[in-house]
Amino acid sequence: MNLLIHIFKRELLSYFLTPLAYVFIVIFLALIGSFTFYLGNFFVRGQADLNSFFVFHPWVYILLIPAVTMRLWAEERKTGTIELLMTLPLTTTHAVLGKFIASWFFIFVALILTFPIWITVNYLGDPDNGIIFAGYIGSLFMAGAYLSIGSCISAVTKNQVIAFVVSTTVCFLFTMMGVDLVLNFFKLWAPEFLVNTISSMSFLTHF
């Protein structure tokens, strides 16, 4: 457990010692805020809820989370520090979990910084805070799914750009599987069980 905590602290610290963390958080907050209040027509809708906030999370994660995961293992492989890491008295499980939890916690911090939007909704009306809280939990778990994909792809390449592009593509495909336009296309010729299987693989279906 101590080794897992050590990897977690090391990885989390590496985020905040570089501009990456701050750039990610600023872009995330700017995109989410813009999408919620402008594209989501927050004020025009006249409803005290955060539907227009959460609906854009899968699409924002498609680009931003691969930017976080692209360096998890690709950088270690490129610089050769992965050999040093593997010589330490820890298991592969400790290394993988430590890096994953650190990146997941980083996303958690970014989500916490969106709480002013939640406060704004409560100031403007009387929302169902239970649903909003559940939305945050769901978004965090969805982010974990994106992180799993990005981490896996980062582990098989030394090039961070390749890791980013491939992770973005895979996350995009998994998200698009739940879009009505795509599902309607498959309904034209595919059996129902296949359509349901494709739909169940999408992040949109479960969020």
How would you label these PLM feature ranges?
Residues 99-100, 135, 167-168:
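Residue-level recognition of transmembrane alpha-helices
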Residues 1-64, 68-72:
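Hydrophobic alpha-helical transmembrane segments
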Residues 49, 68-86, 100:
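Transmembrane helix boundary and interhelical loop/hinge segments in multi-pass membrane proteins
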Residues 30-36, 115-117, 170-180:
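Aromatic-anchored segments of alpha-helical transmembrane domains
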Residues 34-37, 44-50, 54-55, 60, ...:
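Secretory targeting signals
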Residues 92-93, 160:
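Alpha-helix N-cap/start motif
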Residues 42, 47, 156, 166-207:
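Terminal transmembrane helical anchor/hairpin motif
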